[in-house]
Amino acid sequence: VIERSMEPFFISSIDKIFVVVGFEKERILKIIECHPAEIIENPFYSQGMSASIRVALPYIKGYEGVFFQLGDRPFLDKTLIEKMVHTFQENDKDIIVPVYNKKKGHPVLIRPAPYIEEMEKVKGDMGLREIIDKYRENVLFIESQEGVLTGLDTQEDIENLKKRGYEIEKD
């Protein structure tokens, strides 16, 4: 699941990839060891996804745009990533969010500079949601596929996908 979630980024035109690891760090490092990524360790992973955002901030401050992707979204493709990059470059919006059936998904592409102070304060599993909601005028929502919503966090998530006809490989 993790490798499939990251694959669209590895094969895209993105210049630099950072991967934040915490929970099951050794297993994740083994999965991604053959890919070009800089590893950021998150000792605070038990505090939720926002801790991963906070520990990444020193690494991303100089970048024009940064994707935030979850490790449990295996149904994304390179086309979406490239579409988001192109949309980001062609618009004056600071944040690009894919949506499916009017629901916000992942990954999120953000121009970090205007939001660094607020990103330093995010807590729990809210991630960038509060920033997206607060600065809606700076957000461009783009229609996407169901994969932007489909996370595989639990065995129940996997079983639900199987019931819908998906074949799921074991890591």
Task: Identify the function of each model-found stretch.
Residues 2-65, 79, 121:
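Conserved N-terminal catalytic core of the sugar/cofactor nucleotidyltransferase
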Residues 121-171:
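Conserved alpha/beta core of the MobA/IspD/sugar-nucleotide pyrophosphorylase nucleotidyltransferase superfamily
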Residues 24, 72, 145:
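A generic "binding-loop/recognition-motif" signal
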Residues 40-42, 98, 142, 152:
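Hydrophobic residues at beta-strand termini and immediately following loops
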Residues 23, 113-114, 147, 156:
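Alpha-helix/helix-capping structural signal
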Residues 46-112, 117:
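Conserved beta-loop-beta/alpha segment of the NTase-like Rossmann-fold superfamily
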Residues 14, 36, 92-93, 136-138:
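A generic structural signal for alpha->beta connector loops
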